[in-house]
Amino acid sequence: MSKRDYYEVLGVSKSASKDEIKKAYRKLSKKYHPDINKESGADEKFKEVKEAYEALSDDQKRAQYDQFGHTDPNQGFGGGFGGGGDFGGFGFDDIFSSIFGGGTRRRDPNAPRQGADLQYTMTLSFEDAAFGKETIIEIPREENCETCKGSGAKPGTKPDTCSHCGGSGQLNVEQNTPFGKVVNRRVCHHCEGTGKIIKNKCSDCGGTGKVKKRKKINVTIPAGVDDGQQLRVPGQGEPGVNGGPAGDLFVVFHVRAHEFFERDGDDIYCEMPLTFAQAALGDEVEVPTLHGKVKLKIPAGTQTGTKFRLRGKGVQNVRGYGQGDQHIVVRVVTPTNLTDKQKDIIREFAEVSGNLPDEQEMSFFDKVKRAFKGE
């Protein structure tokens, strides 16, 4: 897409003076500034106006543009001015914040503010995560200094109001811009935005008003928490500032793996090894669950991969929406290190059965054969 003529963009003639260019730019930039104009395409027009002004307000760039237009043989006016300049060192965004009142409001440094949140990682056993528990944790956190009551000043003294900002925590900074002089507000570097100067600092906290301590906190872990979930403990974060509320503590859970169980949501999965005889003849076996051992009937002819479900033997939903199930997957164990007698028995079994698979296995092998024959 070809660029429009810069003079056309600003609506001025090629003989326009600097003042005329500046006046046109101020009018158009106010019209299309994104903080003022919410119409579609206003942002692009604003960038176009800004780019045109950057080119025509500089004598050297204007002369090059008048000679070469947009196709500059030097690949841009001394490094380019395609909307990315900073207007010679003054903050463009600050200018419009001052003009249009769209800047971020500075907070009152003496206003109450909530303390910072804290995070603590807790490692749980598989069982503790499933059933929940009450425990005590110890966390390092900042607390208000008891000696100075959080003021940072030596007992018997008070912080002075900052003489540079008058206690506001902000300074007015005057800048020269294309629109004239603009006043911006900055954080006072003398008091670091607090509005106060502490001349006689508390010896215990060094003037910060805070001290590091280890705090013991009772935590109730709900049943059913899972790895990566977190628990919010209100009011147990860092203390507030200027009488504001304390932050919160977030306890993040890491659940250790179990040697027998695996978890998927509220359901539990485990593998049950069976001997060849148990799988072939059937049996009644004891299955471990989180809630104790239960008896499970294994029907004759059970194959590897067969699944059984124990309803209600999983994990309680952490939000109270019922209970999960336990899923048992059978794995038939092939015997190894057989004695001579055992080998003879298996050979005899093979001879009696004719070394042929049963009906279920026959149907499977038939399907394989048909697949190879292309049937």
From Swiss-Prot:
One of its GO terms (cellular component) is cytoplasm. Keywords: Chaperone, Cytoplasm, DNA replication, Metal-binding, Repeat, Stress response, Zinc, Zinc-finger. The keyword Zinc applies. Binds 2 Zn(2+) ions per monomer. It holds the Pfam family DnaJ_CXXCXGXG. Residues 5-69 form the J domain. One of its GO terms (biological process) is protein refolding. InterPro entries: DnaJ, DnaJ_C, DnaJ_domain, DnaJ_domain_CS, HSP40/DnaJ_pept-bd, HSP_DnaJ_Cys-rich_dom, HSP_DnaJ_Cys-rich_dom_sf, J_dom_sf. Its cofactor is Zn(2+). The keyword Zinc-finger applies. It is found in: Cytoplasm. CXXCXGXG motif repeats lie at residues 145-152, 162-169, 188-195, 202-209. A zinc finger (CR-type) spans 132-214. Homodimer. The J domain is necessary and sufficient to stimulate DnaK ATPase activity. Zinc center 1 plays an important role in the autonomous, DnaK-independent chaperone activity of DnaJ. Zinc center 2 is essential for interaction with DnaK and for DnaJ activity. Belongs to the DnaJ family. This is Chaperone protein DnaJ. It comes from Bacillus velezensis (strain DSM 23117 / BGSC 10A6 / LMG 26770 / FZB42) (Bacillus amyloliquefaciens subsp. plantarum). The lineage of its organism: Bacteria, Bacillati, Bacillota, Bacilli, Bacillales.
